[in-house]
Regions:
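Low-acidity, Ser/Thr- and Arg-rich intrinsically disordered low-complexity segments
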Residues: 1-18, 22, 26-27, 31
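Residue-level detector of transmembrane insertion/anchoring sites
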Residues: 4-5, 13, 37-38, 42, ...
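Intrinsically disordered, low-complexity segments enriched in serine/threonine/proline/glycine
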Residues: 8, 26-29, 38-41, 49-50, ...
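Acidic, mature catalytic/reactive cores of soluble proteins
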Residues: 20, 24, 33, 41, ...
Length: 665
């Protein structure tokens, strides 16, 4: 807050008058001259949130527990953070100022009292009824979402986006009347710190007109709209307005630091054009292949939209704690940067013509892992933060009652033996495409190989981050082999320096060990862990990294076993059987979309093309109307499960589409 604003506020507080309020609260009524502010300070206990006068608007009771199905959410991004907007017109998830920050709208994992911003035709906010039609789409090759509402009285188009490249995050919602007239309703419930903090909300006047300003400690947001919503029940702001044919009404929500002056209104026409141009220019680099171009392009756009533009870090998903099993405890925070996901993204970007983005991700990877080679983590914060302590938000009931809601991720402390292999495989592909190593990048890769060498006998938690005891996971051992193999290739084929003989010896030793202990002749399959009879969908990665050919008899035997043990009744693939594999959690989850895409890729690469296409088309049908995918799919309820949108699923889709397109060639 500026010195002038602070001075005015202090003066107002000094001259305020207090009176008793309901529920034993003590209220202070004051005005701030010159700023057009008239507020009530409500003091309860130790916390002193300041709120605008709670005018009650008849008929505007707050609607609670309206969380939509996961697939009903659209996603928009400004490359700093992102928002989820339900088909019912409610923004139920937005974290500020970046992907892994606290939420301002947190109804997704709570109730409407934990923050949301509804904008929809009046009387239709509980559910989309038969009296109204709703259609939505992205403008081609962008993350600008259009929702067309047809009601009994008229038709409106709502355009929603987050401008790219400004100094701070802005959420734009434009309402255009197309036919007749439509009464629109908005309900703004601002709740900072994952729904725990009710901000100080007041009206201000500036050169751009009237606005609502909300402040909570270091954060502030401001709504510019005409008309502004009025103070409603439970410290919400609600209102209705009518849009006639040919009329356009704009709403813009700005996020900024509370110690800064409120930002001016933006030119929405210009912002819309600039944002559309950005996304279309970016996606124009995509090298089209034929089949599944629309799905691959959207998947690449999702990967870009989950990327923090300044740091280059890509988050695994926009959300935390969307359940893998509804009502269960498998709820994790995915708003961080996994080395595995970043490495796979680097591969996908390079394969499809996004060379600059691939280099950006390489640089993020190298910065994140710089330092002690004995201390490489599996995941980092958006800027490379190492400490991501996990805690439970007990005040949030969770998505459809799926508790606990977690922030942070305790897996950052886990040892997962596969991660260095993922990174080394991706960086080797960059080398093979002509990207030269510098002294810094190759030194760090040598350090990574030293990390593998130092941990070569160590058991791990595996790719699925199991919270049970550490074991010898076959996939992890294969990825350690892949790391050493790419080191050997770098010396032999690219002339880089390194202890060739030692790396080759370690590589060959790992291969012999895996073939002896990771393959069961009894079931004719590789196994999840050494000495077990359980299988795991991660075994489909073995041919992807060149450990064996896709059509090797041992791989084909493994595929047969996976089909027998892990395919569900709808033909989608589970990661593993949670009932029999001890992962430290209660059993129960749904088919994993990335693994199912891996199976489609395996089919395509071994001549089972018709089966690959059937599975691919089945999987495409698990996405929503906007082309977005979650982590898992509940085939019984025909609905998405897990965090969303999920980078890993989109990455696997790209690989499967590439394999099928190679079959056409």
């Amino acid at each position: 807050m500026s010195d002038k604003a602070a001075e005015l506020l202090a003066s107002a507080l000094k001259n305020s008058r207090s009176f008793a309020g309901r529920e034993g609260a003590r209220r202070l009524l004051f005005s701030i001259g010159g700023l057009g502010i008239d507020v009530v300070l409500i003091v309860r206990g130790q916390k002193k949130p300041v709120r605008e006068s709670a005018r009650r608007t008849p008929g505007c009771a707050s609607v609670r527990n309206m969380t939509a199905r996961i697939e009903d959410y659209g996603f928009i991004s400004d490359l700093r953070t992102g928002a989820l907007i339900s088909r019912q017109g409610s923004i139920d998830w937005l974290c500020l100022p970046r992907f892994d920050s606290d939420s301002v709208f947190g109804a997704l994992v709570g109730t409407t009292d934990h923050g949301r911003w509804l904008l929809a035709p009046a009387h239709e906010n509980k559910q989309v009824s038969g009296r109204m039609q709703v259609e939505r789409r992205y403008l081609p090759s962008t993350f600008i979402m259009e929702t067309r509402w047809r009601t009994a009285t008229g038709e409106v188009l709502v355009t929603e986006f987050m401008p790219i490249g400004g100094s701070g995050t802005v959420m734009i919602r434009r309402v255009q009347g197309l036919h007749g007239h439509v009464v629109m309703r908005q309900e703004l419930v601002l709740r900072f710190s994952y729904g725990k903090v009710v901000p100080w909300v007041h009206r201000i006047h500036d050169d751009d007109g009237e606005a609502l300003l909300a402040i909570a400690g270091p954060q502030a947001v401001m709504l510019r709209a005409d008309p502004l919503p009025e103070a409603g029940p439970d410290y919400s702001h609600v209102g209705e307005f009518t849009v006639e044919a040919g009329q356009t009404l704009d709403l813009q929500l700005h996020a900024f630091s509370s110690h800064d002056m409120p930002p001016p209104a933006i030119d929405i026409d210009r912002a819309l054009q600039t944002t559309a141009t950005y996304w279309r220019s970016w996606s124009s680099n995509y090298l089209r292949q034929g089949n599944y171009d629309r799905e691959v392009e959207r998947s690449l756009l999702v990967l870009r939209a989950l990327t923090h533009e300044r740091t280059g870090g890509i988050v695994a998903a926009l959300t935390t704690s969307l359940p893998e099993h509804f009502g269960g405890e498998r709820n994790w925070d995915y708003r961080y940067c996994w080395l595995r996901d970043a490495a796979l993204t680097l591969e996908a970007m390079m394969t499809h013509g996004f060379h600059q983005e691939a280099l950006q991700w390489r640089n993020w990877l190298l910065r994140a892992i710089a330092g002690d080679p004995h201390d490489i983590q599996i995941m980092y914060g958006v800027s490379g933060e190492r400490e991501l302590p996990e805690r439970v938000l007990a005040h949030l009931p969770g998505y459809e009652g799926s508790a606990p809601v977690r922030v942070g991720n305790g897996a950052f402390r886990q040892y997962q033996g596969d991660v260095v292999g993922e990174v080394m495989v991706a960086l080797a592909k960059l080398r093979n495409r002509g990207v030269h190593e510098d002294h810094f990048s190759w030194t760090l890769q040598r350090n990574m190989l030293l990390f593998v060498e130092n941990n070569i006998k160590r058991k791990d938690h595996g790719i699925w981050e199991m919270r049970g005891e550490q074991r010898d996971f076959t996939h992890s051992r294969v990825m350690m082999w892949a790391a050493m193999d790419r080191g050997v290739q770098a010396v032999q084929e690219h002339g880089l320096d390194g202890p060739l003989e030692r790396w080759a010896e370690l590589r060959d030793g790992l291969r012999a060990e895996i073939l002896e202990q990771g393959f069961s002749r009894e079931i004719n399959s590789f196994t999840q862990t050494y000495g077990s009879s359980e299988v795991d969908a991660s075994l489909l990665v073995l041919p992807q990294v060149g450990f064996l050919a896709y059509d090797d008899e041992r791989i084909l035997g493994t595929v047969s076993r996976l089909e027998r043990d892990l395919l569900d009744g709808s033909g989608l693939l589970m990661r593993y059987r949670t009932e029999s594999c001890l992962d430290g959690l209660e059993p129960g989850e749904h088919p994993f979309l990335a693994c199912s895409f891996w199976l489609a890729e395996q089919y395509a690469r071994t001549g089972r093309v018709s089966e690959a296409r059937r599975l691919m088309d089945r999987l495409i049908g698990c996405g929503n109307d906007l082309g977005l995918f979650s982590e898992e799919y509940d085939t019984t309820g025909n609905r998405m499960a897990g965090n969303y949108p999920q980078a890993f699923s989109h990455l696997a889709l790209i690989r499967a589409a590439d394999a099928l397109n190679r079959c056409r060639q």
